[in-house]
C-alpha cells in the first residue's frame, strides 16, 4: 500500500439504538480533499456533553442511517493543503479549533479531519501553553481542550451584554464546570467584571477559590436561594446581579428572580446553556432541553427579565481572545483526564459521570 493511502479510524454511531464504535475507512491522501480544503492529522480531540446528547437524541427516521462521528474540538498538524487554500495555512502548521456539526459524517474524534479553513471556523494556529516542568500534558492536549467551552463562555459574556464594568456583578450556577471555569477567567481577566459569585458543592469551594471567584456559595448546605440572599445582603450591599449564568440546569431562582436579577430595562440577563433542570446524561430526552417552560420563557413578551439559551456555537473572534489569554497565562485549559484512542469508551464514561473536573481529552498520537 502506498504511503499516501492510509486507514482513517473514527469513533462513530448511527443512531440512538446503536453503540459508539470505531469504524475504519481507506483514505487516499492524494485525492481526498478539494482545492479549498486541508487535511489535518488529528493529535487530540476533546469530548463535550453535546457529543453524547446528540447521540442519545438521534432518531434514525429523522437523522438517517449513515455513520456520525463524535466530537468538535481538535488539535493537529496540516499534512495536505489544496491549491486554493489561503497561504496562512501551510503543510506542517500546528492548528486547533472547533469543527461545528450536529450529525456530521465528519467529526474530530478521528485520525484525519478534512475541512475548509475559510468556512469551517474557528481554526487557529496553536499557541504554547505556559507549563511547569512537572506538567504531564503536551500542547496538543491543551489545544484540543478549550475551543468549545471557552467559546461558549465568551459568547455569553460578549453577545448579550456589552457594558461590563468593575461595578458589574454576575452569579454563576455550576461554578465547577469547564464552561464556568472559562467564564470566570474571561469575566475577571478580559471584561474586568468586578464581582463574580459561584455556586458549587462544599467540597469544591477550595478548588474554585483559586479560579478567581470573589465569593462561593455551597448548594449542598441548605437552600441555594437563601444562601445567595444572605451573601447579597451581607457583602454585596443587597445589590442585584447583572447576569445569572447557569451551566448545569437549575430553576430555583425563577420564582424570586426579581430579588436577584436587575430589571430588564438595565440590560440584565438570565442565560442558561443547560435548560431548567440538570440533565441525566444516561437518560436524555428532548424535554430536558426544549421544555414548555423554556419555550414560554423565551417567547413570553410579558416576562420581566431577559432569558436566553446560550449559544452552542460562538462567534469566530473568541479563538484569538483565547490564544492571547493562554499566552499571557490568564487562562490555562483545565484537564481532568487523557485517554488513548482505543479507550474512547472509558473517556465517554468519565464525562458522563458528572465527576470530571476539567476536560476529558482523547489522544490519537
Swiss-Prot record:
<keyword id="KW-0496">Mitochondrion</keyword>
<dbReference type="InterPro" id="IPR036291">
    <property type="entry name" value="NAD(P)-bd_dom_sf"/>
</dbReference>
<dbReference type="Pfam" id="PF13602">
    <property type="entry name" value="ADH_zinc_N_2"/>
</dbReference>
<dbReference type="InterPro" id="IPR050700">
    <property type="entry name" value="YIM1/Zinc_Alcohol_DH_Fams"/>
</dbReference>
<protein>
    <recommendedName>
        <fullName>Protein YIM1</fullName>
    </recommendedName>
</protein>
<dbReference type="InterPro" id="IPR013154">
    <property type="entry name" value="ADH-like_N"/>
</dbReference>
<dbReference type="GO" id="GO:0005739">
    <property type="term" value="C:mitochondrion"/>
</dbReference>
<keyword id="KW-0551">Lipid droplet</keyword>
<dbReference type="GO" id="GO:0005737">
    <property type="term" value="C:cytoplasm"/>
</dbReference>
<dbReference type="InterPro" id="IPR011032">
    <property type="entry name" value="GroES-like_sf"/>
</dbReference>
<comment type="similarity">
    <text>Belongs to the YIM1 family.</text>
</comment>
<dbReference type="GO" id="GO:0005783">
    <property type="term" value="C:endoplasmic reticulum"/>
</dbReference>
<dbReference type="Pfam" id="PF08240">
    <property type="entry name" value="ADH_N"/>
</dbReference>
<dbReference type="GO" id="GO:0018455">
    <property type="term" value="F:alcohol dehydrogenase [NAD(P)+] activity"/>
</dbReference>
<dbReference type="GO" id="GO:0005811">
    <property type="term" value="C:lipid droplet"/>
</dbReference>
<dbReference type="GO" id="GO:0006974">
    <property type="term" value="P:DNA damage response"/>
</dbReference>
Amino acid at each position: 500500500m502506498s504511503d499516501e493511502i492510509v486507514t482513517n479510524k473514527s469513533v462513530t454511531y448511527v443512531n440512538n439504538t446503536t453503540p459508539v464504535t470505531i469504524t475504519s475507512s481507506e483514505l487516499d491522501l492524494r485525492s481526498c480533499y478539494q482545492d479549498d480544503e486541508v487535511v489535518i492529522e488529528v493529535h487530540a480531540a476533546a469530548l463535550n456533553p453535546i457529543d453524547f446528547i446528540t447521540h442519545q437524541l438521534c432518531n434514525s427516521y429523522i437523522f438517517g442511517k449513515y455513520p456520525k462521528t463524535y466530537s468538535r474540538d481538535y488539535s493537529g498538524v496540516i499534512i495536505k493543503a489544496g491549491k486554493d487554500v489561503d497561504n496562512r495555512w501551510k503543510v506542517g502548521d500546528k492548528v486547533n479549533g472547533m469543527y461545528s456539526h450536529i450529525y456530521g459524517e465528519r467529526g474530530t474524534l478521528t485520525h484525519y479531519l478534512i475541512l475548509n479553513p475559510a468556512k469551517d471556523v474557528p481554526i487557529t494556529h496553536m499557541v504554547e501553553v505556559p507549563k511547569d516542568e512537572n506538567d504531564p500534558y503536551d500542547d496538543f492536549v491543551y489545544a484540543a481542550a478549550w475551543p468549545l467551552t471557552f467559546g461558549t463562555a465568551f459568547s455569553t459574556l460578549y453577545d448579550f451584554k456589552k457594558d461590563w464594568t468593575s461595578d458589574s456583578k454576575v452569579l454563576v450556577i455550576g461554578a465547577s464546570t469547564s464552561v464556568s471555569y472559562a467564564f470566570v477567567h474571561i469575566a475577571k481577566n478580559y471584561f474586568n467584571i468586578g464581582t463574580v459569585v459561584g455556586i458549587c458543592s462544599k467540597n469544591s469551594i477550595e478548588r474554585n477559590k483559586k479560579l478567581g471567584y470573589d465569593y462561593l456559595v455551597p448548594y449542598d448546605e441548605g437552600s441555594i436561594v437563601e444562601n445567595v440572599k444572605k451573601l447579597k445582603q451581607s457583602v454585596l450591599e443587597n445589590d442585584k446581579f447583572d447576569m445569572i449564568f447557569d451551566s448545569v440546569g437549575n430553576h430555583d431562582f425563577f420564582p424570586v428572580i426579581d430579588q436577584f436579577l436587575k430589571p430588564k430595562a438595565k440590560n440584565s440577563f438570565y442565560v442558561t446553556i443547560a435548560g431548567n433542570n440538570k440533565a441525566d446524561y444516561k437518560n436524555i430526552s428532548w424535554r430536558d432541553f426544549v421544555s414548555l417552560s423554556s419555550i414560554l420563557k423565551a417567547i413570553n413578551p410579558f416576562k420581566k427579565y431577559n432569558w436566553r439559551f446560550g449559544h452552542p456555537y460562538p462567534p469566530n473572534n473568541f479563538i484569538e481572545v483565547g490564544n492571547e489569554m493562554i499566552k499571557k497565562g490568564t487562562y490555562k485549559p483545565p484537564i481532568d483526564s487523557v485517554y488513548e484512542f482505543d479507550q474512547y469508551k472509558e473517556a465517554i464514561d468519565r464525562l458522563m459521570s458528572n465527576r470530571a473536573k476539567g476536560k476529558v481529552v482523547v489522544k490519537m498520537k
